Amino acid sequence: MSALNFDQKKTLAAFERFFGSRYNTHAEENGNTSMHVETQKMCYLLKMAGVEIGDFNYSWNFRGPFSPGLLVLLRSIDRKEADVTEFYENAEEKEKFLLGLKSKIDELREKLEIDKHLNQKEQWVEILGSLTYISRTVLP
């Protein structure tokens, strides 16, 4: 069993705070990409709001802003199910990774009305991420 690194832990803690649910390491099996899409868009939206989850660069993808570096990180998380479970069960360690980020994440969640769209969160964050990316890179 290999331990999670700093960026993996920060991503997992931010995911739970942003979406109100835990990252699912099995979501990508059988070609389902929703967990990765949600996390890609969440990290991009947080970065645009001044909350840096990792040092990721984004470019346009057919599903909106995409970071190859973040995909590598997410795939490494997917292979560490036991470590992910252990991290989520350790409230003290989770809190350490959210220090100074909670209020910013909560404020963004509220502004983006994440709770209203939990049933369609993948599509909602895709739309929000895409609009944000286009408004910052394409439109004057």
Question: What is the predicted function of each stretch?
Answer:
Residues 1-140:
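Domain-edge interaction signal
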